[in-house]
Amino acid sequence: MSVEVDKHRNTLQYHKKNPYSPLFSPISTYRCYPRVLNNPSESRRSASFSGIYKKRTNTSRFNYLNDRRVLSMEESMKDGSDRASKAGFIGGIRETLWNSGKYLWHTFVKNEPRNFDGSEVEASGNSDVESRSSGSRSSDVPYGLRENYSSDTRKHKFDTSTWALPNKRRRIESEGVGTPSTSPISSLASQKSNCDSDNSITFSRDPFGWNKWKTSAIGSNSENNTSDQKNSYDRRQYGTAFIRKKKVAKQNINNTKLVSRAQSEEVTYLRQIFNGEYKVPKILKEERERQLKLMDMDKEKDTGLKKSIIDLTEKIKTILIENNKNRLQTRNENDDDLVFVKEKKISSLERKHKDYLNQKLKFDRSILEFEKDFKRYNEILNERKKIQEDLKKKKEQLAKKKLVPELNEKDDDQVQKALASRENTQLMNRDNIEITVRDFKTLAPRRWLNDTIIEFFMKYIEKSTPNTVAFNSFFYTNLSERGYQGVRRWMKRKKTQIDKLDKIFTPINLNQSHWALGIIDLKKKTIGYVDSLSNGPNAMSFAILTDLQKYVMEESKHTIGEDFDLIHLDCPQQPNGYDCGIYVCMNTLYGSADAPLDFDYKDAIRMRRFIAHLILTDALK
């Protein structure tokens, strides 16, 4: 019995003492294999124990059995440990004993490996037979090993084309018997050289390598590739290896035969251009020459036309230059404006007499001009005197005629009865203005006027004065809150246009506690603000004036209003806090009559009775 069998028995005795200790090293070893050439699209590889490829060596049958023993024991122990985790501790022991019994049976009773038909496997068989037998053992499990499930594959597989890991091989050999084993250093060096040769990257000055291509038909599987592939995968080792899955190459959709790169016209065309060997075909050359000839003929025609045009322009230029020269010569010959035909000598006396006459004429002319200027000045003075006299007459008439008349006893009694009435009856309803007894009682002494009474008086001023418009108190409220869009239809309701008016009156309610007045004088181009409680212009009055100016500009479509003056008009100041509405009505009355605002407090008292009389007599008829 050889030394290998003794070593094997010692290991079995050790495992009888400790049946859970493995017969193989727990360290996984890897080996670098070149890429599969016939299936370049596959990049993932599977790891399994049943698909290990071992290198075939011409050793004795003990070497074969020892390798087989290590392989089967490795898979059986792993299978036993996996089942123990599922079936329990006792089931694991049972599976381990069963597998170890099978292992002993195949080791000592069936000493030689056999095929499925019972024939012995020759030691010098080729790699293809052995690879098929190893594949059949992994699938049919003749030695009682567990099947190789697809779930045993790793989730994250390694790509051996980029990883070169050392190969660790162990053999149970007799001393001095069998083939000499190579040292691990030399095997590693050879593996590294093989991997480097397969995965080497070379750089060339020619980036495409047109002249070095050796191509074949795409999709063809050569015999050399398959033979090299089989030899590379027939190396068996114990441990874990990454295997490329064998997949059928995807065929083209239409099953058309692909043309090699060397035979394609595009590649040959690019190669010729890159190497400078490309020549234009004769057809293209002839067509190009023909097109160039046609272009030359067209150019000749164009040049003939251009020459004729240039000649004509040059002739015209020469003619014009000659004409100009002739004109200049004639002008130089007869350039004098005055031509002396005859000369006459004048004596000194005659010369002095002429000078005297000239001076006399100048003096006479100056006298005439002065007389004309004096007459104009007298006319201006006379016109000025007439204007002053007219103004004096108007003032006298206004002084004699009061704008706020006094009522007779009958009218005064009628107003007093209406103020004393306790029924809230309707006194007037005209032009969308309805006045009741409650509104009428605001005209009593020491009372604030409401917006209905002020609207009535504005309507009275509008009807009694031509080319005048007087809005109600809501006009400026909408203008200040909504801008021009809030009042753009108010002038249309009056059925007139702003450029045909003389004056516009707008009563202004300030914080619902005070009344003021805005006067737009379109003839004088002024916008005035009148307030009976203000001592002068302020920020609020300026804001009101600018709003009214913007309204005039928008209403007239920017034809007028830009050059209007914003002024603060002086008016009599109210001595109390309840006559602001009456003062607004009085300012409107005096402004519509172009009278100066010089009324007094007594006129304000009479103004209440006058407005009441207008309401009772229905002055809006």
From Swiss-Prot:
Task: Quote any Pfam family the record assigns.
Answer: Peptidase_C48
Keyword Ribonucleoprotein among record annotations: no
State one molecular function term (GO): cysteine-type peptidase activity
> Where is the sequence biased in composition, kind Low complexity?
124-141
Q: Write out the catalytic residues in the record.
A: 514, 531, 580
Instruction: List the keywords (alphabetical).
Output: Acetylation, Hydrolase, Phosphoprotein, Protease, Thiol protease, Ubl conjugation pathway
Give the span(s) annotated as Disordered: 116-150, 169-196
Additional remark text: Present with 377 molecules/cell in log phase SD medium.
Member of which family? Belongs to the peptidase C48 family.
Q: What name appears for this protein in its UniProt entry? A: Ubiquitin-like-specific protease 1
